[in-house]
Amino acid sequence: MYSIIQKICEKHNKILKEGLEKVLKGADISSLTSAIADFTNEIGKDLLAEIVKQIDELVFEDSKRQKEYESVRFGERKYITQNGKTKFERRYYEDKETGEHIYLTDKILGIDKGERIDKKVKSEIISRANDQSYKKSGKGVVPNVEISGTTVMRNVRKNDWKMEIEEKKEEDKIKAKTIYIQVDEDHIKQRKKKGCTISKIVTIYTGKRQLTRPEKEEKVVQIRRELVNKFTFSGLYKDNQELWEDVVYYIDCTYNKETIENIFIMGDGANYIKEGLNWIPNSVFVLDLFHLEKYINHLNYDEELKKKLQLAIEQYDPISTENIMNEAIERIKKEITEDKQLGRDTKRLENRLKKIEDTKTYFINQWSGIEAHDKYKDKLTGCCQEGQVHHTLSERMSTDAKVWSEEGIDEMSQLRAFTQNGGDVYAKIIDISTAEKREKKIEELEKRIKRKAKRKILGTTGVKIPSLTEARGELYYELKKMWYGIAI
């Protein structure tokens, strides 16, 4: 190993020498740091190719391999690493028993079939794509290499970003009296489709914790809070059963059921949200106040009726609420009749009538969710799902007139939730890569080769970089002059 690194260092020593010379001639230290970066990147690329070559030789020389696999030819692979783009050759083998063709060295090194980008680089571009466009995500990750937006997109889509949920031991499960489940959706423009596609989001938590210190409350515009034990699901979830199965499974794996007293499902009252009541025993639906206010504002055209409606709802009076809505409907109908008699266009009023009739139906259908605010007022902490929708989905997917494919909506929604749940992108890529079961004989070969590599390749790693270690080299004298002020 020593001789390999020494040889590579000598090959690229010129880069480091030029950087030092620039500093001696008056350039600032950035010239040197840039040269050091280029130097280490060149070493990294060549070192990788050399190690692959030596591993390949060990595979070729392995006596047991010779009985099981026939060497067919050499194959070149171009590979993008953190140091830049490199290339290396390794042998292509044929399984004598099955006839299957395989790069054994790739298998040993954990390089997947057809893989052209190192997994660490993949994790970086995917992590960037979580927050910015695919095109921007491929820039500046690898020295002198720009990874295309299409390549970034493919790497996001080829992985399943659903968080793996592991059941906790009973003694480790969260003991909580109340669980809050906020459910909402974002409307995202889909390519080649009229209208928008819905991406659903579920946020599960056990309460809110104030982050703003009490002594600063009067000085800030908004008090900052965070959700306790927060976990997020997101995706298309076209099948509502799949959505609620995931939620129920997470609760079963994470929470101690003996301590749970209340489970509140909060949202706008859509059927798929209320479906959760059938999946989670003793759960209660709570209409979120954002959507309640939105429907109350449908009466903005009539301040008198709107104030009456607000008062009736604040008093949790369903009869008065229905009567006020009936009054609003009758007033509009009367206006329509009068305008028709005068020969005026009534389309605007007819649209308003439809809207107010729908609003009345909404209040009637969601009344139990409205009353829940009164019945459980000591246990509710308020619904903040609109903020969760914006933070998880809208920021990346529905602002600035972005357009997505259906697959892209699903994958990015899952990825955004995955990272917010603390998921490790690199670890996930490795898990997916190693999930495929390998043949026993390849695993045995890998163990043998790694033992030999440790002994034959690693060895001593002491390395001398010529420019820095020559006892009386050119740079030695230049640096000496600089120290004593002879050279400027």
Task: Enumerate the language-model features and the residues they cover.
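Short acidic, Pro/Gly- and aromatic-enriched capping/linker segments at domain boundaries
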Residues: 60-79, 370-379
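Catalytic center-proximal scaffold of phosphoryl-transfer enzymes
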Residues: 1-49, 93-488
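Short Cys/His-rich metal-coordination motifs, predominantly Zn2+-binding knuckles/fingers
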Residues: 65, 82, 96-100
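Extended assembly-interface regions of large multimeric machines
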Residues: 59-60, 83-86
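N-terminal accessory alpha/beta regions
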Residues: 45-68
